């Protein structure tokens, strides 16, 4: 089967990412790796690779590229698409489509066997003392209660999902940042969306 040098580079990059991380790269990452600035050009090469039976794509999902001739496919971890939530609509289930920004292909083992999980991308440095950095994605098990001191994702008065350490105190709830420069959030009522059970960080 004849493919171009560029298509070979793209195919090898996808294969190496799947083997190393357990999930495929994004179109942007593919473009950066092979020197293509146009996402439409990358899509064109992917379409040709798919037409030649080397990959299979799911157009309804991001990053959904499957290598069809990966020799050690049995060793590749299973991937689950985890919803990444953004602004939370009050009164809606946390994983309602209105709340989901995108889906992230997480290796199944990182979900720790949990089925009701979602992810939240951390914006800012409010949890740096807990080792949670700006740009990290926390893995969250859905639950509506927490024990004092647990790291949770809760809803603020502005309907934004925030990651903080939870405390129930005498007359209020305290959402405590893990950053000495920031003040806690004090609330009369709090809606807990889930408990943080893991973290994903892209070190590139």
Curated annotation (Swiss-Prot):
Keyword presence, Repressor: yes
A Pfam family hit: Peptidase_S24
**What sort of enzyme, by top EC class, is this?**
hydrolase
Determine if DNA-binding is one of this entry's keywords: yes
Q: Which residues bind DNA?
A: 27-47
InterPro entries in UniProt: ArsR-like_HTH, LexA, LexA-like, LexA/Signal_pep-like_sf, LexA_DNA-bd_dom, LexA_repressor, Peptidase_S24_LexA, Peptidase_S24_S26A/B/C
Q: Name one GO biological process term.
A: SOS response
The record's active-site residues are 126, 164
Kindly state which keywords UniProt assigns to this record, in alphabetical order. Answer: Autocatalytic cleavage, DNA damage, DNA repair, DNA replication, DNA-binding, Hydrolase, Repressor, SOS response, Transcription, Transcription regulation
Give GO terms: molecular function aspect only: DNA binding; serine-type endopeptidase activity
Q: Which HAMAP family match?
A: LexA
Q: How does it assemble?
A: Homodimer.
Alphabetical list of PANTHER family matching this protein: LEXA REPRESSOR (PTHR33516), LEXA REPRESSOR-RELATED (PTHR33516:SF2)
Its family remark reads:
Belongs to the peptidase S24 family.
Q: Could you tell me what this protein is called?
A: LexA repressor
Q: Provide the species name.
A: Listeria monocytogenes serotype 4a (strain HCC23)
């Amino acid at each position: 089967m004849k493919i171009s040098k560029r298509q070979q580079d793209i195919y090898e990059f996808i294969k190496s990412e799947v083997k190393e991380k357990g999930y495929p790269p994004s179109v942007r990452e593919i473009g950066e790796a092979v020197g293509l600035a146009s996402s439409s050009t990358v899509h064109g090469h992917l379409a040709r690779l798919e037409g030649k039976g080397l990959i299979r794509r799911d157009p309804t999902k991001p990053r959904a590229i499957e290598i069809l001739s990966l020799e050690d496919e049995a060793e590749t971890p299973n991937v689950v698409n985890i919803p990444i939530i953004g602004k939370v609509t009050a009164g809606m289930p946390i994983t309602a489509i209105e709340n989901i920004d995108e889906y992230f292909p997480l290796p199944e083992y990182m979900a720790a066997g949990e089925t009701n999980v979602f992810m939240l991308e951390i914006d800012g440095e409010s949890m740096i003392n807990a080792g949670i950095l700006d740009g990290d994605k926390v893995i969250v098990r859905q639950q509506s209660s927490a024990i004092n001191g647990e790291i949770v994702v809760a809803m603020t008065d502005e309907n934004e999902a925030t990651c903080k350490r939870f405390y129930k105190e005498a007359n209020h709830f305290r959402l405590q940042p893990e950053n000495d420069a920031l003040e806690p959030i004090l609330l009369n009522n709090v809606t807990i969306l889930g408990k943080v059970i893991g973290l994903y960080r892209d070190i590139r």
